[in-house]
């Protein structure tokens, strides 16, 4: 038991500090911006300090454990704890949220509410990644949805209300299945109902009941990830949201679905996961091809960027369903890798729109000359998205490939077939990834426009882009920095499939 409440402070601090925004003096938006950025930086430093000095990466057990009785009536506890699975997403959340607040600098309408919602979303996401109580996990999951809905509905494009409504209908529908799964697992406790995740992990369930629980949790996480055919909210949401909100969606929110698949479907329900893993492998393979094929038909730049998120999720699903430590480590690395790359591409798409006021690719062209810095950064992250060697995406996809090939669960012919189809998807990926910068920056359409109407990236955009690009290169060169966090926990999870 940890005696200093590090995780409670880390979870509560952003939303508590965010609520003070409404009491700041009315002296313009600058005070609110700087206050929010300082809160995010302080939170990131606090998280980094706590993990550096109080977390042992070679220990697969839950660390920084906190357990406080909250509601006596039905034995509801405030249980927090982290392990190798959650530390990476928590640090990613802190990093991307800090940069997203910097990206939101141009937002001036209702800036107090906007920045409060970003900080509230921050708390909900960290709470989801660190919860060790099933009901607390559900509460944090829902807490994070409310700010996202308001950010979508109040700041964005002309169809923002439609996209926000579609988002909340999909996610609320998924949350119903999540709540049913949580209550089902809780009520089927060994002797008495329990919401404790550790107790539930050690509990054995009848196969039929475990399959029912698995399907319920899977639907909830498939909506958030997203997994086809429950992905249709994603392009509309990304197409209408402000680009700082898109950074949070692509960088963190989608990763919560993948985290839930590993944390609950895989760790809590291993027998059902073993049964469903061949089907997940097929879904992941179809998803890679589907996203690569559909992306080419998107005229909207932000929708074109949204579909690679679906494709990358396909690799994560395949890694999770490979039932090998190599494949699962590759999936975890892909979660972190795409968090950086997706956030960067949406930021660059948004800043480009701020300058040229065009969002359809067939209306763009020839802006490489007046905006060379933007061209360089966008091209670099497009290369990272297509998994160029030396960048994080390449290592993640390569490890997932090795996970399939070395897996013992599947026969040789199915493994070769899945690998072949994945290879086709990888061949299609450069087509849609490189067609974006070609349509935007090459050609002639905007070449003769007045050069003073365009201005290139400023210090804020350069700082933000470089801040994301450095981890992408760093992980690509030395992936063990991320892999070492979860390697022991991955072995423990996979041991359930062979020794339980």
Swiss-Prot record:
Catalysed transformations (reactions): a plastoquinone + NADH + (n+1) H(+)(in) = a plastoquinol + NAD(+) + n H(+)(out); a plastoquinone + NADPH + (n+1) H(+)(in) = a plastoquinol + NADP(+) + n H(+)(out)
Top-level taxon in the UniProt lineage: Eukaryota
Compartments (UniProt record): Plastid, Chloroplast thylakoid membrane
Keywords: Chloroplast, Membrane, NAD, NADP, Plastid, Plastoquinone, Quinone, Thylakoid, Translocase, Transmembrane, Transmembrane helix
Record GO terms (molecular function): NADH dehydrogenase (ubiquinone) activity; ubiquinone binding
Tagged with keyword Nucleus: no
Membrane-protein topology: Multi-pass membrane protein
Predominant location: plastid
Enzyme category, top tier: translocase
EC numbers on record: 7.1.1.-
InterPro entries xref list: NADH_Q_OxRdtase_chain4, NADH_Q_OxRdtase_chainM/4, NADH_UbQ_OxRdtase, ND/Mrp_TM
N-terminal signal peptide: none
Transmembrane regions: 4-24, 35-55, 87-107, 134-154, 167-187, 208-228, 242-262, 272-292, 305-325, 330-350, 386-406, 411-431, 462-482
Biological process per Gene Ontology, one example term: ATP synthesis coupled electron transport
GO cellular component: chloroplast thylakoid membrane
Family: Belongs to the complex I subunit 4 family.
Official protein name in the record: NAD(P)H-quinone oxidoreductase chain 4, chloroplastic
Organism this protein belongs to: Solanum tuberosum
Gene: ndhD
């Amino acid at each position: 038991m940890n005696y200093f409440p590090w995780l409670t402070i880390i979870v509560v601090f952003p939303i508590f500090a965010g609520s003070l925004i409404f009491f700041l003096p009315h002296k313009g938006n600058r005070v609110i911006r700087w206050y929010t950025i300082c809160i995010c930086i302080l939170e990131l430093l606090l998280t980094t300090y706590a993990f550096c000095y109080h977390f042992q990466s070679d220990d697969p057990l839950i660390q920084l454990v906190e357990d406080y009785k909250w509601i006596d009536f039905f034995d509801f506890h405030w249980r927090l704890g982290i392990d190798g699975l959650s530390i990476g997403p928590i640090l990613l959340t802190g990093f991307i949220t800090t940069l997203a607040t910097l990206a939101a600098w141009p937002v001036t309408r209702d800036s107090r509410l906007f920045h409060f919602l970003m900080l509230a979303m921050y708390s909900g996401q960290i709470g989801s990644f660190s919860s060790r109580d099933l009901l607390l996990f559900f509460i944090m999951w829902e807490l994070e949805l409310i700010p996202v809905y308001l950010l979508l509905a109040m700041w964005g494009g002309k169809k923002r209300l439609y996209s926000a409504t579609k988002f909340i209908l999909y996610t609320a529908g998924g949350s119903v299945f999540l709540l049913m799964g949580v209550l089902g697992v809780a009520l089927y406790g060994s002797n008495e109902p329990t919401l404790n995740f550790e107790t539930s992990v050690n509990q054995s369930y009848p196969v039929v009941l475990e399959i029912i629980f698995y399907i319920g949790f899977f639907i909830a996480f498939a909506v958030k990830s997203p997994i086809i055919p429950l992905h249709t909210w994603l392009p509309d949401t990304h197409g209408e949201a402000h680009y700082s909100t898109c950074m949070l969606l692509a960088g963190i929110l989608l990763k919560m679905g993948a985290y839930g698949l590993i944390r609950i479907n895989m760790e809590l329900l291993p027998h059902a996961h073993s049964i469903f893993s061949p089907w997940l492998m097929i879904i992941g393979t179809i998803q890679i091809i589907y996203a690569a094929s559909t992306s080419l038909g998107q005229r909207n730049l932000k929708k074109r960027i949204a579909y690679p998120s679906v494709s990358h999720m396909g690799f994560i699903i395949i890694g999770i369903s490979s039932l090998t430590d190599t494949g699962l480590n590759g999936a975890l690395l892909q979660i972190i890798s795409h968090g950086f790359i997706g956030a960067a591409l949406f930021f660059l798409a948004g800043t480009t729109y701020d300058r040229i006021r065009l969002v359809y690719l067939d209306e763009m062209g020839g802006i490489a000359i007046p905006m060379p810095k933007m061209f360089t950064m966008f091209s670099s992250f497009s290369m990272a998205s297509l998994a160029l060697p030396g960048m994080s995406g390449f290592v993640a996809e390569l490890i997932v490939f090795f996970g399939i090939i070395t897996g013992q669960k599947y026969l040789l012919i199915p493994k070769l077939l899945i690998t072949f189809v994945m290879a086709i998807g990888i061949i299609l990926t450069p087509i849609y990834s490189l067609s974006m910068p070609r349509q935007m920056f090459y050609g002639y359409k905007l070449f003769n426009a007045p050069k003073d109407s365009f201005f290139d990236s400023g210090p804020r955009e350069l700082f933000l882009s470089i801040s994301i690009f450095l981890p992408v290169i760093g992980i690509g060169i030395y992936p063990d920095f991320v892999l070492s966090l979860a390697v022991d926990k991955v072995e423990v999870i996979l041991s359930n499939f062979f020794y339980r």
